[in-house]
Amino acid sequence: MTSQRTRERLIQRLCEEGVSNTKVLDVIRRTPRHLFVDEALAHRAYEDTALPIGHNQTISQPFMVAHMSELLLEAGPLDKVLEIGTGSGYQTAILAQLVERVFSVERIKVLQDRAKERLVELNLRNVVFRWGDGCEGWPALAPYNGIIVTAVAPEVPQALLDQLAPGGRMVIPVGPAGEAQQLMLIVREEHGFSRRVLGAVRFVPLLNGPLA
């Protein structure tokens, strides 16, 4: 079930759903998603669906990974991206092959440790990890010209807005956990921020504080 044919079916599905960035599609095609899920779920790794990874977290649906990556890159290449919510490390691995440097924050230590191991296995070495509160971002290394948030916040954290470079782009789900949520694209412009609502989504909540 992890054959090239299985992966190609996923790519075909993503194209049918509107993903058109060939770089994003190529990276998803060659990234072994089955390495980012438990062995018992490996046979479902190339389905276009979110899957549980423990600790009440999920590996995001491939379409959402592709869509958010595509939105982030819509205005051109990025050299410095902040990811909030490492999770399984799958989105991290996709970003690491699309941008120059990724800075990834995860509050659940055991998930972060597993993600690190997977990225080393894939020889992806342009990622720096931080165990901590994603709501705070990573101010010491700011600003970032891209920020991607993989959990839903009731409102856009001001700390993340502050860490977005001029012209930078943030993709973030916003809304109450378990209720109607919207994916938003935020761009830092000369005199403030522009916001574009991109459609309904469902994500796990963005929580405060690190967790061992």
Curated annotation (Swiss-Prot):
Name the catalytic site residues.
S60
Keyword annotations for this protein? Answer: Cytoplasm, Methyltransferase, S-adenosyl-L-methionine, Transferase
Which EC number(s) does the record attach to this protein?
2.1.1.77
One GO cellular component term, please give it: cytoplasm
Subcellular localization is given as:
Cytoplasm
Ranges that cross the membrane: none
GO process terms (BP): methylation; protein modification process; protein repair
Q: Does the keyword Oxidoreductase apply?
A: no
Q: Which domain of life is it from?
A: Bacteria
Uppermost EC category: transferase
The reaction(s) annotated as catalysed by this protein in its Swiss-Prot or TrEMBL entry are: [protein]-L-isoaspartate + S-adenosyl-L-methionine = [protein]-L-isoaspartate alpha-methyl ester + S-adenosyl-L-homocysteine
One GO molecular-function annotation for this sequence?
A: protein-L-isoaspartate (D-aspartate) O-methyltransferase activity
Its primary localisation, in coarse terms, equals cytoplasm
Describe its function.
Answer: Catalyzes the methyl esterification of L-isoaspartyl residues in peptides and proteins that result from spontaneous decomposition of normal L-aspartyl and L-asparaginyl residues. It plays a role in the repair and/or degradation of damaged proteins.
Question: Which family does the record claim for this protein?
Answer: Belongs to the methyltransferase superfamily. L-isoaspartyl/D-aspartyl protein methyltransferase family.
Q: Which PANTHER family match?
A: PROTEIN-L-ISOASPARTATE O-METHYLTRANSFERASE (PTHR11579), PROTEIN-L-ISOASPARTATE(D-ASPARTATE) O-METHYLTRANSFERASE (PTHR11579:SF0)
User: Would you tell me the protein name for this molecule?
Assistant: Protein-L-isoaspartate O-methyltransferase
Q: Which organism is this entry from?
A: Pseudomonas putida (strain ATCC 47054 / DSM 6125 / CFBP 8728 / NCIMB 11950 / KT2440)
